[in-house]
Amino acid sequence: MSTPSQRRSGRGGGPSGTPLSPTRITRLQEKEDLQELNDRLAVYIDKVRSLELENAGLRLRITESEEVVSREVSGIKAAYEAELADARKTLDSVAKERARLQLELSKVREEHKELKARNAKKEADLLAAQARLKDLEALLNSKEAALSTALGEKRNLENEVRDLRAQVAKLEGALSEAKKQLQDEMLRRVDAENRLQTLKEELEFQKNIYSEELRETKRRHETRLVEIDNGRQQEFESKLAEALQDLRRQHEDQIRHYRDELEKTYGAKLENAKQSAERNSSMAGAAHEELQQTHIRIDSLSAELSQLQKQLAAKEAKLREVEEALSREREGGRRLLAEKEREMAEMRARMQQQLDEYQELLDIKLALDMEINAYRKLLEGEEERLRLSPSPSSQRGARSSGLQHSGAGSAKKRRLEDGEGREGREGRTSFSHHARTSGRVGVEEVDLEGRFVRLRNKSNEDQALGNWQVKRQNGDDPPLTYRFPPKFTLKAGQAVTIWASGAGATHSPPSDVVWKAQSSWGSGDSLRTALINSNGEEVAMRKLVRTVIINDDDEDEEDDEVSIHHRHHHSGCSGSADPAEYNLRSRTVLCGTCGQPADKGSAAAASSASSASTVTVSRGYRSSGGGIGEGLLGRSYVLGGAGPRRQAPAPQGCSIM
């Protein structure tokens, strides 16, 4: 017969040097542990069978008259083989179920990876859309700034146009005033020329009058001279000549004085008129030139204003287009964001469902590991009792498996004393956590002794916690509620610890807050902590359930009772499918349905040459005394061998009854 180490060396002949993942290593180690345990169980069963055969031979050699005893032994053997066949069937079904669960687990992991990839892609699309929205908003701000600048320039140009128009009106008034002054000066010039002509005519008239008077005077003098003596004629002529000469001289002086005065007045007025005309003409030319320049500037400003108005209209049209595009982008972004949020909610729900399923599978695996370790301890106890020496490799596998199981859970063992004074009772405490978060802030940690509750902001943005509530409840007890201050804000990536006043912590917000009105958050076996926002909606929750399992052991752990349940269907025991129990110490088969011992000669022998066996192990606990405890654990776990199974014929009826 091949030893377990030889079979393991035959199975482990795979390619060396290929790196294996931790999951694959764990699966291989679990497979080796199961194979090792099955090999040891096979050795143990072979040893039991050999001992039974030796006992039968000894009994036959001692006395031939103990046929009843031999029939009982053969009946026990037949019942054992039948139950072993049923156990193999059960092992096959459980192995298939385990393979199916492993396939479903791998499928769920693949779906989880795919959902994570899709979520990352959707988040990248969302970030791109947000970046594009920011760019469009920046472009809109720049366009608005350019529009405000153009409007300011337009207002400045309009002010300049108004100023230029006022200057043009002022210059036109000055031009009209200059024209009026020119007309007045021309009128004064004409008046002066008329006066000059009048003075010339008066002078000519005075000359004519003086000449007439002179002739009249000469005629009178001539007439008088005729009348005067001849003696005095010369005297009178000389006097007349002198008088005429004086009169002529006076008239000439007066005429010369009038002429000089008239010439001076006319020259001065003419010079003033010329200077005024020159000034008016120069002012009119300057005003006309300035008016032309003003007209040119007004035309250029009007053209520039029309161009600016066209640019403004184009900018306004472009701004309307940008606003419409921005509104469309915002609407698309809102729709995309809503779709992303809906998909994220669906993915969260699916992830939560997958995590729940994975948690169930993990609980099943932990329970399997625990029962494998229990099975190993029971088998080691029986090997020691039967003085079967296990291989060194199996001892190493048992130690490594025990280390893995001890590190897998968070259970604590404690000694308990019951009311009747029983000692040696061993308890195990297990904790189950359930957390859920639908926002940025989640419940990170709760203290079992009621000292604190810790919240953490796992996002990249600050979260305002004003008027938010933290509600703590133990089972059906009244809840304890803490309310945040109105202006409290939890920074991105930071945590806040809310201490009870009895914990002795220091109040240093925003990282540590002391609840002065409450000395403790409360403790118990079912603690539920929830975070509620200002709208009364629950955004985060963490539930912690503590379960204490009491195990009654003897002072020596190697004295545990072992029951091997062989699953089979009874057609004669009220149609029940409960297992029969095989007590390794008493070697008596008990029917799990009716509780009667098996008939040693009531079944045929089955094949016992299989290379591996498959059984279902359940562990019974007792507090004192020997024998099997009545309260066996309800769990049964299957261990399978690597060799080919040989099926025994199924019993048609209850072999015990």
Swiss-Prot record:
Residues 429-546 form the LTD domain. Residues 242-382 are annotated as: Coil 2. SUPFAM superfamilies: Intermediate filament protein, coiled coil region, Lamin A/C globular tail domain, Myosin rod fragments. Residues 70-79 are annotated as: Linker 1. GO terms for molecular function: structural constituent of cytoskeleton; structural constituent of nuclear lamina. Keywords: Coiled coil, Intermediate filament, Lipoprotein, Methylation, Nucleus, Phosphoprotein, Prenylation. This is Lamin-A. It comes from Gallus gallus. The lineage of its organism: Eukaryota, Metazoa, Chordata, Craniata, Vertebrata. The gene is LMNA.
